[in-house]
């Protein structure tokens, strides 16, 4: 809401957002990028936000993880006992007895592991959830305390929401259950080696030589992965900005048929994100391959060396195997840490930017409690020799030694042309910025010496673009004062003349206002903003074009309200309109950052050559109504009016806001008060009905083009899966060899060693292949889903975006987080599933060939393992669904607050926003904690069952050996084959959490992809007229906004507009004037009745073509964060479509060429987010040029000149007059000067056309609506 300051950009604006030339800018960006690549936070810093209970949870979780990790080495010891029991008692009657004792120990171990595993998972998941929540709110809190300059230069709303929804998930992943898993695996590793040294140190030492190699491979991999993932994040952040801009300005996009362009630029950015995800996949695979290669080779070494030890050092075969197995189990667990390491790396990269922001000390700190707090202030304001330039454009001086004194209780008005620096004065008094040198004093004390929060609480700001938050009217007003009572709020609405219209709304004070206050008309929003300022009871009142957005009737009443409020307060007014200014105690005329004149209205008029007199004369030219005085007032007023409106826009120029508002002022009103509610209750079904389940086949079908890639990947995964069970056979063969005579032992140990190396080489080839192929398939799928979903969303009818669950913040979160999750369902999940199936299958085959009876017995028990896995998946699923959308609501709170940071700052509402945010987060956090408990139980239980299965199988084996049905060797072959298979299977269950989240994500994405747009701009069918005359007819229209079905806008509206004529629509704020424009553009369709163009029903015409015939200039122009040239060319559909000469011709017509050429980079100036770097008047002229480039047959002007001061307004009006020739033009306006020359004036009242005719005829109707509107203007300006 860069309203004030940057708007003041007027002057400011002459500079692009950075002072470097574009080329240099790109280079520095590249340098920054390269630095950014490797930026990470040291791991322990991720836990900087843990409190004492978190520390306790982490300690318990770590103890559990260590216990759980140690269970494996202990199991191998028991296993050594088993080999001995079997070996020594093969032919013994005691075998069952001896073995069953060992088996019982297995059961005890299982029980211990159950407890440890529960602690590990539950504690880590819960603490991860808690800390992530704390990081989110700390981040939001620091974002809110930053100085306004930070938002001008370093960040934007899209980025903040992206970090809060996307990056915190990565951080939570890195500090939650993954840490527990990591500790578990590491303790298996360490514990294993300690036991191995006890059993046989020499052999262990030999095997240890491979560890450094393993570690190096792992480290290299982590490094590469981190790099690739931060590169991917950077690319995706750019794509997110495209989403935010497009959906936030959907009406502008639709009107200029810019959907194609948005889709193309989105695709460009997601393709670069795709490339880095492939790199990431390949490097992970390569790392794993190298690790396994080293691992199997070290095995080969151990077997050859172990054979040597048996011959030379008298080791027993059992001891050698024991050492080898322990070392294997230990090192294997090290290999399994890779997903954890990847997650840590991604979390550290994500945390870097967030923590940098959290650490940033703002230059102007709202939370700083130091500084003076006085009993009260008188309210003298002085600017002393102030030098200032906006942080976004440091080389452009706004003030160069500016001074101004306003005594307490006085009303000072600042006038001057657009861009002279008027609003900058207000930004400095609010201390949004500090001057470079010089001082701003209140009661003679430098503003910097006061406690910021306290001094802001003494200042009330009503700006030209009031920003409201997505909550109820009551909550919006309550921002003015902490703990305000309902009585105080009601009194404030009375004073601000808002009580009447609020009472009419179905829910009264509890009516929800939409994103950026879209559900209300401009005048209504302004009155709520005034009520909010009144509630504060400020000593100093700052009015930045406060009444400009109102029509004559409301403006008069609001002005009276303001006059009442201004009594005994120091008031600073920025205005174009003289009527507002004349009664001020002092008028200061500002020109290019200098005060050229000051005095009262009458004093300044005495100097007929003075700047003030010239401004007044300018306004009179625009008018020839009765007396010059009157006229001047009224036109000024209007102009002002306008300004404000325009202003409005920049605030949050979400286009949605924009449009609605524009769309009719009131529509405004009518439009939305419900919408949010609706979003939740009536239309709300959308948010409440569970989304239909998406079948996996449907998602898989999207991956169709990658079938060859997936097939190859599957083959690789299958080979990879078979490696471990094969490994099991080899071990049992080796055990056999170790008990053979010396010469055979020597020969066999060499042979098996070579086989092991071969196994390693296979792994080295297969692993990277598998990862790379699945990364390609998964990456392409994500890219395809993102572009499908975005493409579909962009073509939705405008009404769809009025629902809160489709706001720009929510859509951004859907596209970034959900699409990534879906990949887990197809690519990653498939690769893992195939690998596990292969492990299981090969394990079973090997087991059955060895001893079918034993294999069958074990097989019967396998479902136990399966059931437990299933239970775990089921539990994970239950909770992830709502948690995600709940966080979406919370991120909407953040989106609102960051988008309106000036309002939050001036009302010291940071605490309030934080409370709302925390309230929205409570539910999801509770769910996360519940999920932790249940997952912990499931996880622990799976271990217990596993150990019981082992105990039973060995007991059964002992029985079979006793009965002579199998040999001790085969028992081990069955055991190893199945253990290895089980390890594979248990790995797959670790992926359970992702699949449940992914299904929910898929449902939310497919809900968009499957929805039929009611008014689809991508639909190429429909008639296209050869040549358009421009006759428009509206017959018997009735209309209500879909979001507020209970408020009727049009009842039975009829209006005929002849080709080439100009029709002006007038009426009160909220009568539905702008709605006519929305309907002509087919943003909405009427509920009944017909609209025709040249006799053809609009619905029968091709939508895209229809919109290309119309040029819209709204009261709040939406510009994109791109160059001026690109913004103008947007009218043509793309920068390539418009030639340089067309662009310049359009700019000249719109009277914009002069100011564009005077900026350093001319047409290559970047206008900033929502056009912030330009002043209101400049934005408007660029918007007019954009409409002109289209060469439209029909021109729609919705308060188009309202935001301009007298000088620019005259010139733009001339431009418009030139453009309007021979075009059908529809003008919505408050200001008489604009309306008088129209061929037909239509007065809209109560949903119908009450009067129509020319100015001359209508003015003569005694007591007519038009005549009384004109009369109002006159008196108001008097």
From Swiss-Prot:
GO cellular component, one term: plasma membrane
Cellular localization per UniProt: Membrane
Catalytic activity annotation: (indol-3-yl)acetate(in) + ATP + H2O = (indol-3-yl)acetate(out) + ADP + phosphate + H(+)
SMART domains given in the database record: AAA (SM00382)
Region spans: Disordered: 1-35, 629-656
Segments forming domain ABC transmembrane type-1: 58-346, 710-997
Domain ABC transporter positions: 381-617, 1032-1271
Amino acids binding ATP 1: 416-423
Superkingdom of origin: Eukaryota
Matching Pfam families: ABC_membrane (PF00664), ABC_tran (PF00005)
Chief localization: membrane
Recorded GO MF terms: ABC-type transporter activity; ATP binding; ATP hydrolysis activity
Glycosylation sites: 483, 568, 653, 806, 1121, 1222
Binding sites annotated in the UniProt record for ATP 2: 1067-1074
Knockout-associated phenotype: Slight defects in primary root elongation. Increased incidence of root waving and skewing in response to mechanical perturbation and directional light. Reduced pistils length in the abcb1 abcb11 abcb19 triple mutant compared to the double mutant abcb1 abcb19.
UniProt feature, compositional bias: Polar residues: 629-654
InterPro entries per record: AAA+_ATPase, ABC1_TM_dom, ABC1_TM_sf, ABC_transporter-like_ATP-bd, ABC_transporter-like_CS, P-loop_NTPase, Type_1_exporter
UniProt entry keywords in alphabetical sequence: ATP-binding, Glycoprotein, Membrane, Nucleotide-binding, Repeat, Transmembrane, Transmembrane helix, Transport
Entry's transmembrane regions: 55-75, 106-126, 182-202, 205-225, 285-305, 314-334, 711-731, 751-771, 824-844, 845-865, 932-952, 971-991
Biased composition range(s): Basic and acidic residues: 1-13, 21-35
Function as written in the Swiss-Prot or TrEMBL entry: Involved in the regulation of auxin transport required for pistil elongation.
Family: Belongs to the ABC transporter superfamily. ABCB family. Multidrug resistance exporter (TC 3.A.1.201) subfamily.
Name assigned to this protein: ABC transporter B family member 11
UniProt organism field: Arabidopsis thaliana
């Amino acid at each position: 809401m860069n309203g004030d300051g940057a708007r003041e950009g007027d002057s400011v604006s002459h500079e692009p957002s950075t002072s470097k030339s574009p080329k240099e800018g790109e280079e520095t960006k590249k340098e920054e990028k390269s630095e950014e690549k490797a930026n990470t936070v040291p791991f322990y810093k991720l836990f900087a936000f843990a409190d004492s209970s978190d520390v306790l949870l982490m300690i318990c979780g770590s103890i559990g993880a260590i216990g759980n990790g140690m269970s494996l080495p202990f199991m191998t010891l028991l296993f050594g006992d088993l080999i001995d029991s079997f070996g020594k008692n093969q032919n013994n009657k005691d075998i069952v007895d001896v073995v069953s004792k060992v088996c019982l120990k297995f059961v005890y171990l299982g029980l211990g592991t159950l407890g440890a595993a529960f602690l590990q998972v539950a504690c880590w998941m819960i603490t991860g959830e808690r800390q992530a929540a704390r990081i989110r709110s700390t981040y939001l809190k620091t974002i809110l305390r930053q100085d306004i300059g930070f938002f001008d230069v370093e960040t934007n709303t899209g980025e903040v929401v992206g970090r809060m929804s996307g990056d915190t998930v990565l951080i939570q992943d890195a500090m939650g259950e993954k840490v527990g898993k990591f500790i578990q695996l590491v303790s298996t590793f360490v514990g294993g080696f300690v036991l191995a040294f006890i059993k046989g140190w020499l052999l262990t030492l030999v095997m240890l030589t491979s560890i450094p190699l393993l570690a190096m491979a792992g480290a290299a991999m982590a490094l590469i992965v981190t790099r690739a993932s931060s590169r991917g994040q950077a690319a995706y952040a750019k794509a997110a900005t495209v989403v935010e801009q497009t959906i936030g300005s959907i009406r502008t996009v639709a009107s200029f048929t810019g959907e194609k362009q948005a889709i193309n630029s989105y695709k460009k950015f997601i393709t670069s994100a795709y490339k880095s995800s492939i790199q990431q996949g390949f490097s992970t695979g390569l790392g794993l391959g190298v690790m396994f290669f080293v691992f199997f080779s070290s095995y080969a070494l151990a077997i050859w060396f172990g054979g040597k030890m048996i011959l030379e050092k008298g080791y027993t075969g059992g001891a050698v195997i024991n050492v080898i197995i322990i070392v294997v189990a230990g090192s294997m667990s090290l290999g399994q840490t890779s997903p954890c390491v990847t997650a840590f790396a991604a979390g550290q990269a994500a945390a870097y930017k967030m923590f940098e922001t959290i650490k940033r000390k703002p230059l102007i700190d709202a939370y700083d409690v130091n500084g003076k707090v006085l009993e009260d202030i008188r309210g003298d304001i002085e600017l002393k020799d102030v030098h200032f330039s906006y942080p976004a454009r440091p080389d452009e001086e706004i003030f160069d030694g500016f001074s101004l004194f306003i005594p307490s209780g006085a009303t000072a008005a600042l006038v001057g042309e657009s861009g002279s620096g008027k609003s900058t004065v207000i930004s400095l008094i609010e201390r949004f910025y500090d001057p470079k040198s010089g001082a701003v004093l209140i009661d003679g004390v430098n503003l910097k010496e006061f406690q910021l929060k306290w001094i802001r609480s003494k200042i009330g700001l009503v700006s030209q673009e009031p920003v409201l938050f997505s909550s109820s009217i009551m909550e919006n007003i309550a921002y003015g004062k902490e703990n305000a009572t309902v009585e105080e709020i009601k009194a404030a609405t009375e004073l601000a003349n808002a009580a009447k219209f609020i009472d009419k709304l179905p829910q009264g004070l509890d009516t929800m206002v939409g994103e950026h206050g879209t559900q209300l008309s401009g005048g209504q929003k302004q009155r709520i903003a005034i009520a909010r300022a009144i509630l504060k009871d400020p000593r100093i009142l700052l009015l930045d074009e406060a009444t400009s957005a109102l029509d004559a009737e409301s403006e008069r009443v609001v002005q009276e309200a303001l006059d009442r409020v201004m009594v005994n307060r120091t008031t600073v007014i920025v205005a174009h309109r003289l009527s507002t200014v004349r009664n001020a105690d002092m008028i200061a005329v500002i020109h290019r950052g200098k005060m050229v004149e000051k005095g009262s209205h009458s004093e300044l008029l005495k100097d007929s050559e003075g700047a003030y007199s010239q401004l007044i004369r300018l306004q009179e030219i625009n008018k020839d109504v009765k007396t010059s005085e009157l006229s001047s007032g009224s036109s000024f007023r209007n102009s002002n009016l306008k300004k404000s409106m325009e202003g409005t826009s920049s605030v949050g120029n979400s286009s949605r806001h924009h449009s609605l508002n524009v769309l009719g002022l009131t529509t405004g009103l009518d439009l939305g008060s419900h919408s949010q509610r609706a979003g939740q209750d009536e239309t709300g079904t959308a948010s409440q009905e569970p989304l239909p389940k998406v079948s996996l086949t449907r998602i898989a079908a999207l991956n169709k083009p990658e079938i060859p890639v997936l097939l190859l990947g599957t083959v690789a995964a299958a080979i990879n899966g078979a490696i471990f069970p094969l490994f099991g056979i080899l071990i049992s063969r080796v055990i056999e060899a170790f008990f053979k005579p010396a010469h055979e032992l020597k020969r066999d140990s060499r042979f098996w060693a070579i086989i092991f190396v071969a196994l390693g080489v296979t792994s080295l080839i297969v692993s990277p292949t598998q990862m790379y192929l699945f990364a390609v398939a998964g990456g392409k799928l994500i890219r395809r889903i993102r572009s499908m979903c975005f493409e579909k969303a962009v073509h939705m009818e405008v009404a769809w975006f009025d629902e809160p669950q489709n706001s720009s913040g929510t859509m951004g979160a859907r596209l970034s987080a959900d699409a990534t999750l879906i990949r887990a369902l197809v690519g990653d999940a498939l690769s893992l599933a195939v690998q596990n199936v292969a492990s299981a299958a090969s394990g079973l085959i090997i087991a059955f060939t060895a001893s079918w009876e034993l294999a069958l017995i074990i097989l019967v028990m396998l479902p136990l393992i399966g059931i437990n896995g299933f239970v775990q998946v089921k539990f994970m699923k239950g909770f992830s669904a709502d948690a995600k959308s709940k966080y979406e609501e919370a991120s909407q709170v953040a989106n609102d607050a960051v988008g309106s940071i000036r309002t939050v700052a001036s009302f010291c509402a940071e605490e309030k926003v934080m409370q709302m945010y925390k309230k929205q987060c409570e539910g999801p956090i509770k769910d996360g904690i519940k999920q932790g408990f249940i997952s912990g139980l499931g996880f622990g239980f799976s271990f217990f069952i596993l150990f019981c299965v082992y105990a039973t199988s060995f007991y059964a084996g002992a029985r079979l050996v006793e009965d002579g049905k199998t040999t001790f060797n085969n028992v081990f072959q069955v055991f190893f084959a199945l253990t290895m298979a089980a390890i594979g299977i248990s790995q797959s269950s670790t992926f359970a959490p992702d699949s449940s989240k992914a299904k929910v994500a898929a449902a939310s994405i497919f809900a968009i992809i499957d929805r039929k747009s009611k008014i689809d701009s991508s639909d190429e069918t429909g008639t296209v007229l050869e040549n358009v005359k421009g006759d428009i007819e509206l017959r018997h229209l009735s209309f209500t906004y879909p979001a507020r079905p209970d408020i009727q806008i049009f009842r039975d509206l009829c209006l005929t507009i002849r080709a080439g004529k100009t029709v002006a629509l007038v009426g009160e704020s909220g009568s539905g004037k702008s709605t006519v424009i929305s309907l002509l553009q087919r943003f909405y369709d009427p509920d009944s009745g017909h609209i025709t163009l040249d006799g053809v029903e609009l619905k029968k015409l091709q939508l895209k073509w229809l919109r290309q015939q119309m040029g819209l200039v709204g009261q709040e122009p939406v510009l994109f964060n791109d160059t001026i040239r690109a913004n103008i060319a947007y009218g043509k559909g793309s920068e390539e479509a418009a030639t340089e000469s067309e662009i310049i011709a359009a700019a000249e017509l719109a009277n914009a060429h002069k100011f564009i050429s005077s900026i350093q980079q001319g047409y290559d100036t970047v206008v900033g987010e929502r056009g912030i770097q330009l002043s209101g008047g400049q934005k408007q002229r660029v918007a007019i040029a954009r409409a002109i480039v289209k060469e439209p047959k029909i021109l729609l002007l919705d308060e188009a000149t309202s935001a301009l001061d007298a000088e620019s307004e005259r010139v733009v009006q001339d431009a418009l007059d030139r453009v309007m020739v021979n075009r059908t033009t529809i003008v919505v306006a408050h200001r008489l000067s604009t309306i008088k020359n129209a061929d037909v004036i239509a007065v809209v009242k109560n949903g119908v056309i009450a009067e129509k005719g020319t100015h001359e005829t209508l003015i003569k109707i005694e007591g007519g609506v038009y005549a009384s509107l004109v009369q109002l203007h006159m008196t108001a300006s008097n």
